[in-house]
Amino acid sequence: MWKEAAAEALPEVEFRAPVDATALAEAERRLGRGLPAQLTALLMETNGMVGEYGTDVVWSLDRIVEQNLLFWSPGTFPGLYMPFDPLLFFGDNGGGDQFAFVLTPERPDIFVWDHEDDSRLWAARELEDYLHRSLAGSGDWYR
């Protein structure tokens, strides 16, 4: 389902080998929280997606874990940004802005974090909507 949705928006989208349940369980253990169901389903089909110009529209599971652990660490950006704890980052636009699920309160919407002004803006209704918008759009499609 996820590969088909992505290829519909951008036939040249690149896929990776899927992750297995063991890798997902280990990732959730390291993160200390569960992954959103839509993201889990996508990762079980493909371990990330690469769009035009090598943009990591959906990161690999390893990158999701590493980036979120970094952003959730209290010493990473002390006093520079609002807390990232409610967010789970999973992709970017290739220019520094990152896309995330909101974990607290849990909702299916995708938000974008602007690294220049620390704003967090709504970008898509859910993951499939995000894939269509990000893969078919150009530039800063979410603005």
Regions from the PLM with identified roles:
Residues 1-98, 141-143:
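A surface-exposed partner-binding patch
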Residues 85, 107-108:
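Sequence-level motif detector for i,i+2 pairs with an aromatic at +2
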Residues 91-95, 104-105, 115-117:
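Short, flexible beta-strand-to-coil junctions
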Residues 100-103, 122-124:
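Short conserved micro-motifs at the rims of enzyme active sites and ligand-binding pockets
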Residues 104-107, 127-129:
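A short, sequence-level motif marking secondary-structure junctions
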Residues 108-109, 120:
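Long, low-complexity acidic/proline-rich regions
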Residues 118-142:
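Compact, glycine/acidic-enriched structural inserts
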